[in-house]
């Protein structure tokens, strides 16, 4: 970890760059420095972003160091190469919040302390197809999530999880005591979007590039989201992809798609995407013999397959695409307005 002074007037870094922590066996990243009670606290994520992820805390009287790492008996370690983490799911594969680490903290007006941290909830299935890249690892279809933990300061001036009347530990809780402040509930996210607003709702996201008029439009045809084609799904550059994050292991998603492809290289549809290498894509394209068709493209660790063949769909007619997720199972459907949807795949 390196430290350099920032000049807010000139909006630039100034002065020397100093190495304030050199890890011999543990990787640290995402550092924050805050001052409390005459101490500078160095708050850093440790051990990558996988199932050994955690959070460490160090302190120094001088911002330039040297920094002392907090070490305590409750920090369960199975080797000398492991980090001293004040928060981690490491060695606790049975708890709900896995991959816990990378915290930031806040003090409430009432003097309470809370930490927000990254985590992930594992699915029930392992990764049989990931034996080479990720042996023994689990699937995390919801991606990285954020959790909140209540914290407290020890008599010696170290920040730890507030475990209440329970023994001090460093594993995350799924329920914590809320702050003594007024509630500010977040508005409920609508289940349906008819695209009648001039801008997309905040829950929509694009992949790598901002959403702009170069590939989407909400006013070209009111009540519809128009998307203009770009690179294919395997591209790591610009794509026309608008998505919402999974927030549950069981849900349904559907859309009405109007699309008239002219070539087999043109496609559009409904995708359930983990990353560029892993997804299931129900899409419409064009076959030279069968015409306008629908199929499923499956990508698993950049291994591509079509679980079903091409099925003809009606020309010049909107098609309804739907996916139903129940834990590890995804069932696709397709059909037309006023008709019962047909399963596919």
How would you label these PLM feature ranges?
Residues 1-345:
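Carbohydrate-active catalytic/glycan-binding domains of CAZyme proteins
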């Amino acid at each position: 970890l390196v430290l350099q002074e920032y000049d807010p007037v000139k909006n630039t870094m100034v002065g020397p760059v100093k190495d304030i922590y050199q890890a011999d066996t543990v990787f640290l990243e995402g550092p924050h420095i805050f001052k409390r009670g005459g101490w500078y606290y160095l708050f850093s994520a440790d051990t990558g972003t996988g199932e050994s992820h955690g959070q460490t805390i160090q302190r120094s009287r001088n911002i330039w160091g040297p920094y002392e790492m907090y070490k305590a008996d409750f920090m369960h370690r199975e080797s000398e190469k492991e980090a001293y983490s004040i928060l981690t799911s490491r060695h606790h594969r049975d708890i709900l919040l896995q991959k816990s680490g990378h915290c930031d903290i806040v003090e409430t007006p009432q003097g309470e302390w809370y930490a927000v941290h990254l985590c992930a909830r594992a699915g029930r299935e392992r990764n049989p197809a990931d034996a080479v890249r990720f042996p023994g690892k689990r699937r995390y279809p919801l991606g990285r999530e954020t959790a909140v933990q209540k914290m407290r300061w020890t008599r010696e001036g170290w920040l730890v999880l507030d475990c209440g009347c329970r023994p001090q530990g460093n594993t995350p809780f799924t329920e914590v005591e809320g702050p003594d402040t007024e509630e500010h509930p977040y508005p409920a996210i609508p289940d349906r979007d008819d695209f009648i607003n001039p801008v997309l709702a905040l829950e929509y996201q694009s992949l790598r590039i901002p959403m702009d008029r170069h590939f989407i439009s909400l006013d070209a045809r009111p009540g519809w989201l128009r998307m203009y084609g770009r690179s294919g799904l395997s591209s790591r550059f610009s794509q026309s992809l608008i998505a919402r994050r999974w927030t549950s292991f069981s849900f349904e998603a559907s859309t009405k798609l109007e699309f008239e492809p002219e070539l087999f290289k043109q496609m559009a549809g409904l995708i359930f995407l983990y990353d560029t290498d892993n997804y299931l894509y129900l899409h419409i394209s064009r076959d030279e013999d069968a015409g306008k068709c629908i199929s499923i493209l499956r990508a698993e660790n950049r291994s591509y397959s079509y679980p079903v063949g091409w099925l003809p769909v009606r020309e010049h007619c909107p098609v309804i695409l739907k996916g139903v997720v129940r834990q590890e199972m995804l069932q696709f459907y397709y059909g037309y307005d006023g008709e019962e949807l047909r399963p596919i795949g």
